[in-house]
Each structure stands twice: as C-alpha cells, then as structure tokens.
C-alpha cells in the first residue's frame, strides 16, 4: 500500500500524455516524506492531479524552499512570479502553517508567518474563510519524531485540494461520498471505495473508456469507473448477486449516485461468451482469490488468474496491450502472502 502513491501518480501523468520520468524522481526512501516534487507544464496539469488523484491530498506551487527560514525567505524573495500576485489589491489571501512530524502551537505558527512580512507585502485583504489565495508554510521534519528541526521548509501556493479535502472539489471527496457505509447494495466482497477509486486511476479510465469487470459482484469496482466517464460492462457467474434481493440490486448503487447503469451479463469466465477482440480499454476487477469468497465456475478446473490475463488481454484495444501486465491496462488485486 505504501508504494501505491507512485503508480497512481504515474497513471495520472500518463492520462495527460506526460512521461513520469520527465516529471519527477522517486526518493530513495519514499516513506521518509509525504512530499513529491513534480515538474508540470501548466496549472491545468497540476490541478488534474487533485481532480483525479485519490492519494493526492494537495497540489501546490513552490514559491521557495530552504533548510532554514533565512534561506527560505531569500528563496521566496527571489521568486519573480510573486510580484504580480502580491501587488493585486483584488486578491484576498491567508497563510497557513503546518509541519509533517511535529505539532506547532498557535504562537509558533504566528512567529513563522512573521518571517515573510517584508518580502510579501500583500496589497489585498486577509480573508480566513474563502480567500482567493491560500499559502502554506510547510516544515518537513521527517519520520524521526525525536527531531524538532526540519530537514526542509517550503513556502507554497495552494492550487487544489489541501486542508482536509472534504468539500474542496478534489477526487478525495469521493472516498467519503461513495463509502460502503452508505452504499445501497453491498456484499462481503464489495471493494472499499478508496481502493476502487485507486484501481480506476491505475487502469487509466477516462471519459469514453470501455471498461469491463469480469467479476462484477455488487458493482463496487465499476462505480468509480462510471463516475469518471467510463462506459462499463460487468459479468458474474452468480445470478443471485446480479439480480439482488429485497428490492436492491447493482442498479440501486448506480441510481444512488445518478450514474449510468453498466450492462451486465451472467457468464462463466472459464468459458467466456464474450467474442469482442480488441474492444475494451481497461479490465478492472477483484478476482475471487478464495479468502472472502471462492471462485465458482462450470466446467473443468482452470487457473483463473492466468485465464483472466490470457482471455481479457486479447479483448483490450491494441494500444492497451503493452499495459496488460503492469496493472495499467488490466488492474486487479491479489492478496499478499508470506
């Protein structure tokens, strides 16, 4: 799980026709910091990371950085693009202070803001609730809780997300909005909303993408795919889960979120009835690996994981075939075993 932020970030960049290796470099120890420095061609590209990124908690423009506040203030002062923003009297603003690895008192936060009084003489008014501009002084202490001196300090302008994200328009709002706790129709194998959203991103689902879940169950994996504009299909061998019970079914979930209901087919994936080579853009599923639910089939025994790759890789569009083994064209989960 701790490495999911990089594959998802790679997928988000790929959706924008950007090469991940040209945009950022992975840290040697990715657990040491929650921050990733990404170079992007425009604010539109940056905001997309928040609009689709489930593991992206905030997107910021770097105005300055340093190991000390003296170095940080000097770096901000040298940032030429700030002048137009600072001199605009119509732009309201606020400055937040946060630290990863350390809790700061209100007095400490105020003292840190005072460092920028002279280099950032904003012409606009201060507005704490809904400012036009939100800035963040961020100290990166690291995972060593014994330290009190930051390894890095940043002065950032918020572009998207940030704070608690809820209600701020980013994709992380969907984690709460589509939680299973309030889902109309669920079962023991329904995929957690956050995980399903991540899978959707890693499968590169975009508006108009043709997506299939060969183990659709209650449709939990296809909910985010449809949310992001995918045209979805699902198959399952169990007719009971497809039809639902007590007046609730897969259709109930999609009606709940006002989404297009996927086309559903009862099918045995060991003998798939689908005859549509190079048709789908993505296969996104959670196979029945036998822990919460076992695999059901008619006919002879087969290795269903191998069958899934063999069968559905031939049904992916030609441009998606090279991603079938990298969880980008085909994305599914398997349990980790020791």
Regions found by a protein language model. Name each.
Residues 4, 82-144, 153:
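A short N-terminal interaction module
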Residues 76-87, 272-278:
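Short amphipathic alpha-helix with an adjacent loop that forms part of the alpha/beta core around
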Residues 54-72:
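Conserved short beta-strand edge segments in small beta-sheet-based binding/regulatory domains
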Residues 12, 71-82, 115-119, 253:
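Residues that form generic nucleotide/phosphate-binding pockets
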Residues 1-51, 55, 100-101, 128-132, ...:
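Class I S-adenosyl-L-methionine-dependent methyltransferase catalytic core
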Residues 44-46, 66-81, 101:
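Conserved structural scaffold segments of CAZyme catalytic domains across common CAZy folds
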């Amino acid at each position: 799980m701790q490495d999911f932020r990089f594959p998802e970030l790679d997928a988000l960049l790929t959706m924008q026709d950007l090469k991940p290796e040209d945009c950022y470099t992975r840290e040697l120890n990715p657990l040491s910091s929650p921050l990733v420095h990404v170079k992007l061609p425009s604010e539109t590209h940056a905001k997309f990371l928040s609009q689709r990124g489930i593991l992206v908690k905030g997107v910021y423009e770097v105005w300055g950085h340093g190991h000390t506040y003296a170095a940080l203030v000097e770096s901000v002062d040298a940032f030429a693009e700030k002048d137009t923003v600072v001199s605009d009297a119509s732009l309201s603003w606020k400055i937040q202070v946060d630290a990863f690895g350390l809790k700061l008192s209100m007095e400490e936060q105020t003292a840190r803001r005072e460092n920028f009084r002279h280099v950032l003489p904003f012409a606009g008014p201060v507005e704490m609730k809904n400012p036009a501009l939100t800035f963040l002084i961020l100290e990166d202490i690291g995972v060593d809780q014994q330290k009190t001196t930051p390894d890095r300090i940043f002065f950032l302008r918020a572009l998207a997300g940030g704070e608690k994200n809820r209600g701020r328009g980013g994709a992380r709002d969907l984690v709460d909005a589509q939680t299973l706790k309030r889902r109309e129709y669920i079962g023991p194998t329904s995929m957690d909303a956050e995980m399903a959203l991540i899978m959707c991103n890693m499968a590169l689902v975009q508006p108009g993408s043709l997506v299939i879940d060969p183990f659709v169950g209650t449709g939990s994996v296809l909910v985010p795919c449809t949310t992001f504009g995918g045209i979805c299909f699902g198959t399952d061998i169990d007719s009971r889960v497809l039809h639902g019970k007590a007046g609730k079914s897969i259709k109930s979930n999609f009606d709940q979120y006002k989404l297009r209901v996927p086309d559903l087919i009862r099918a045995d994936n060991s003998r798939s009835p689908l005859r549509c080579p190079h048709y789908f853009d993505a296969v996104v599923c959670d196979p029945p690996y036998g822990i919460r639910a076992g695999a059901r089939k008619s006919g002879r025994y087969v290795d269903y994981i191998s069958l899934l790759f063999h069968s559905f890789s031939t049904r992916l569009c030609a441009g998606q075939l090279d991603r079938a083994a990298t969880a980008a064209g085909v994305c599914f989960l398997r349990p980790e075993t020791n």
